[in-house]
């Protein structure tokens, strides 16, 4: 039994994971950084020295030569699948990706169900980790509200993801549910006299325009750092 455990430890110690960081200054870059910091013994920034490729940003897979992908085991994260946009060209792109991937990773049941209709490869459904040094409860939310500029007695609705299509910067990105968000905001506008909406992230034009049309008070922090984002969650 001891020999078997030693062999397993030795096998794990030989794993060298390379992640294809998108360099977009967004959530996937943060996840990549956290992985590298917490798993230095099995991680590498050198593609050539890796034996496992984690395609954490499949939209940038073309930055890795296909010959390098074929030399190694490939583990690929699919963050979500927008079925309404999954046309002939998207299916063709996925078919090429699927030929190179050994196993997939998803973070939700919905994405797993969609992905199972497209591939026979193994799928691991597991949410992202939480770094509790960055995400934690703040005991005095009233102080945070004052610091940020949120009304002390306000009823807050927060939305921290993009909602607008990049092609025209005005059409709703329906897979993110901005139309449903506006419905909820309008409902609470009639219920709460001190409603205030807090937004972060890029491409919020659709929601912002709807808030202006309906004379709804809002705050917008386009690209926040982790410290401020944690404060917003606590407010």
Question: Model features per residue range: what roles?
Answer:
Residues 1-66:
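N-terminal pre-catalytic "stem/leader" segment of glycosyltransferase-like enzymes
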Residues 49-57, 67-85, 104-106:
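Active-site proximal beta-strand in glycosyltransferases
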Residues 141-212:
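Conserved catalytic-core segment of nucleotide-activated headgroup transferases in glycan assembly
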Residues 53-54, 59, 100-109, 124, ...:
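A short beta-strand/loop micro-motif in the catalytic core of glycosyltransferases
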Residues 196-200, 215-228:
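Active-site donor-binding acidic/aromatic loop of nucleotide-activated sugar
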